[in-house]
Amino acid sequence: MFELPSGAEIQSIIATLKASVGFFIPEIYLSLLFMILIVVDLVVKGRKSTLLSVFSLVGLAGSLYFIYQQHAMQAGEFFFGMYVLDGFAIFFKYFFVLSGMLAVVITMADEQFEREISSMGEYYALVVAMVVGMMMMASSSDLLMIFLSMELVSFTAFILAGYFKSNMRSSEAALKYLIYGAVSSGLMIYGFSLIYGVTAQTNLIAISRELALHGADSFVMLFAALLVLAGFGYKIGAVPFHFWAPDVYEGSPTPVTAYLSVASKAAGFALLMRFVYVALPHTNNVQAATLGIDWFTLLVILAVASMIYGNVVALWQKNVKRLLAYSSIAHAGYALLGVIVMDKLGTQATLFYLLSYLLMNFGAFFVVVLIANRTGSESLDDYRGLGKSMPLAGAALTVFLISLVGLPPTIGFIGKLMVFSALIAKGSIFMWLALIGILTSVISLYYYMLIPLNMYLREPVQHASSNTGTQPRLVAQLFMGALMLLTIYFGLFFAPLSDFARYSASIFGLQLQ
């Protein structure tokens, strides 16, 4: 029979909530920013795109201060074990705020937004809301909180993908994203319900403890694992849960494509790593089956399939955004290699790889936006001759693409080197995974270099308008140059980022060896 809580119990709940609020300050701050942006958009009259853009940038930058303050806080659970604060969560909070800021900058540079959208307040508010949701994903330590935070991110992503309402491609992208997202969410929540049915727990640490003590039916756990993996696989865009990615990335506004391909993917990895490392009873032998489930083999299949499929299919793409979409599938596979290692070195490698991907992928999409402003096209053929007419954009895009391949002296080389080193350090079958990663990187060299080949070695076609447009604004060129220099700088002096990734590799509830 249901009974109302006593006065003492209510007082205890209130005290717990008060004690937990201090750990939630960045999310509260950004939620206020979300509401302020909507109010400013409603109150201020006339053209206010620049005001809203700058306000969003400054507001997002302000959240970095509150995140920095969390370094001094004790790692642990709060909000009744539904939320956790640790170095791992703080890393991703920084990551998501920087992603949001870069998305705002790319939006400011995209002239299509000026033509399609008269008021930008709702758009920037949605970008901020998505940052809040992804922060919650990184800190979620409970099945219910995982699902709620994922849905917050998904709903905002659906709207952003279809933000150009008059554009048929954008509307189609949003619809496909919604359908695939609904199916994957349904599968994942069913998997969560099976786990709850077996353990009677929703907290990840409690689930691990319950499974270690009492075990579970291997068939039920295998079925639940596949369903949960489908949800996480959809979020990171890994094969065979990738079907939404090419069409959604191609049809969405380019700043949204960049945002989804980096930030949303990283949020999926944050959840996947916390779930696999914390909710599952951890053993030193990563190849050993846990509760009758060969997690190692499942993740290996996802990683290898993503690397091979993403790189091979990208060979035939003629649309640059679609090409980068397939390459993002391959990069999900490379990042999964670090997860498979299941030790602190592998976690550090994955975090560093995501940092490198943040820089080089946002940089590549920023140049794609500037070129689209001039040519009105995303076709690979219309990139012909742009190396001469847009020399800085050509040089910057070449550097970003070299980094995406994983060649020195760029940050992408260090990212892949760390992932492959973590695999080789494990020996055995892990060395074969490293070899597959290297070979698929060689494949990616071909399609990535098609873009500089068109820009520098082929004459522009007659119908292209690439020689008649204006040069990018000075601020955009300076920002593009800064991203290019940072891509090279951190390829040479990577120690600060590597140390930060190592510091962030400690996950509450599990001490990786």
From Swiss-Prot:
It is found in: Cell inner membrane. It is a multi-pass membrane protein. Its EC number is 7.1.1.-. One of its GO terms (cellular component) is plasma membrane. HAMAP family: NDH1_NuoN_1. Belongs to the complex I subunit 2 family. This is NADH-quinone oxidoreductase subunit N. The lineage of its organism: Bacteria, Pseudomonadati, Chlorobiota, Chlorobiia, Chlorobiales. The gene is nuoN.
